[in-house]
Regions:
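Active-site-adjacent loop/helix segments that line or gate small-molecule/cofactor pockets in enzymes
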Residues: 2-48, 102
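PLP-dependent aspartate aminotransferase-fold enzymes
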Residues: 107-202, 209-211, 222-226
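Hydrophobic "anchor" residues on beta-strands that sit immediately upstream
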Residues: 58, 202, 233-234
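A short, flexible beta-alpha/helix-coil linker loop
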Residues: 66, 89-90, 188, 207-211
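Catalytic PLP-binding core of fold-type I/II PLP enzymes
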Residues: 215-234
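Glycine-rich loop-to-alpha-helix module at the N-terminal edge of alpha/beta enzyme cores
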Residues: 6, 31, 59-147
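Short, small-residue-enriched loops and turns at beta-alpha junctions
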Residues: 69-72, 210-214
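Active-site and channel-lining beta-strand-loop segments
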Residues: 41-62
């Protein structure tokens, strides 16, 4: 059956001027309002390396880098080449009754850099990673509890939101996952008290809290690791 090829670049060029109106109608009207309020409804057109370019060609230094997704820069030539080679190879991807060769290669490479590990579990986002960590911790320890810190942000899916200590995100979605307890960030005494019940499967913590950019003391994370080992908590 004949078909026409989709030219995504042409489609982008045709509709980019309507991006705000389309999002306001069909996606997230509030985000459109916020971008206009803070002056960022600039219509980014291109990303190269560490820079973004708006509709007028103004260049911006991208210090966010997609929350770390673009750690090697946007549209890096080596990454573009790798993606193109995958598309051109017609690999049998996402076959239910098979295992992935490339996933095996990546897991092997990762473990070469972290030889204290035996297995790898891949996830597609931070929130999904937190969800998996909750399951692994409860399954491995047989314990129900999860401890996290005040002012934390771990994601917006159900389990991850249960560990996100921010009313603005949680409001309207409670009750959330039971067994989750918040302690003050940087407070080893509070952590000791929370773990001493030996009912806590895991302590999930950000090395640096992104919401507010709260830094731990030099003693907090090593001390937390020691307490987790003491009480059998992951």
């Amino acid at each position: 059956m004949p078909h026409s090829n989709l030219d995504v670049s042409e489609l982008f060029a045709q509709r980019q001027a309507q991006r705000s109106s389309m999002h306001a109608r069909h996606l997230n009207e509030q985000l459109v309002r916020v971008l206009k309020t803070i002056g960022y409804d600039v219509g980014f057109q291109k990303g190269q390396g560490q820079y973004l370019y708006d509709r007028d060609g103004v260049r911006y230094l991208d210090l966010l880098s997609g929350f770390g997704v673009f750690a090697i820069g946007r549209n890096h030539p080596a990454l573009r080449h790798a993606l193109k080679s995958v598309l051109d190879a017609d690999f049998p991807n996402l076959v239910q009754m098979d295992v992935s060769t490339l996933a095996g290669v990546l897991a092997e490479r990762l473990i070469e850099h972290a030889p204290y590990m035996d297995k790898v579990f891949f996830a597609n986002s931070g929130a999904e990673t937190v969800e998996a960590a909750i399951k692994f911790a409860r399954g491995a320890t047989g314990r129900p509890g999860i401890v996290h810190c005040a002012h934390s942000f771990h994601g917006l899916s159900y389990g991850a939101l249960s560990l996100t200590d921010d009313w603005n995100f949680r409001s309207g979605f409670e009750p959330l996952l039971p067994g989750c307890t918040a302690i003050p960030f940087n407070d080893l005494a509070a952590l000791d008290k929370a773990l001493s019940s030996r009912e806590v499967a895991a302590f999930i913590v950000e090395p640096i809290q992104g919401k507010g950019v709260n830094m731990p003391s030099d003693e907090f994370l090593p001390g937390a690791a020691a307490l987790c080992r003491k009480y059998g908590t992951l």
